[in-house]
Amino acid sequence: KAFEAAILRNFGGLEDFERVLIHALRRSCGQRVLLSLMADDTLWLICTRAEADPLGAVLLDLAAPAAPCTEEALALRVRVIDWRHCARRYEEVLAARHTS
């Protein structure tokens, strides 16, 4: 629930976030799209080169397609993301930060 609340705070809900993520994948042609938890506990969606060091703690790391894809293909890719894994990673990072 904490991860869902963070998505809501930062993106306006999971459906809105999925639309933003699809748009980022479409525009990032051949790069990486990261969902990162920053030091101030905000979530950032970052488009970066494959070899670049990520900012923040990465919760989700997707390779954007090298060629433009249809909206349907990108939406399908987003629908199969394991959000439970992202939520577990979010909880782990927060717990590690608050016990240090």
Enumerate the language-model features and the residues they cover:
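Feature for soluble, non-membrane regions of globular proteins
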Residues: 1-100
